[in-house]
């Protein structure tokens, strides 16, 4: 865990081994970074949560292993000048906060990207890449993720 003062983890949570939760302090943003994880969450091993903006995860969320939840990337992909700079040397860029509702199930190796909301009770399939909002109680899968039920 990096950036502990910006991270809240609820009661009765289980975080699998080799997982990383990082809140990057970025003075250029007007609001402080925040990662909030609700009570009763269970995350599989090799989980990676990284924020420069805000990630709010509701209660009783479950994930498979190797899930990525990230509100940021290294540089704005539309900025052609950055393409000649190594990714780890580019400024960190966020397209918006992530909100994951209560009782969401996220399959193995899924990626939840910046600026999305996943509604309560939704299911995200294994290997899905979530780039748009997912309504409550729906099932989404694919790259990019789309509603399948």
Language-model-derived ranges and their functions:
Residues 148-149:
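Short active-site-adjacent structural elements
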Residues 2-114, 143:
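Flexible, glycine/small-residue-enriched loop-and-beta-strand segment within the central core
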Residues 111-145:
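C-terminal/domain-terminus segments
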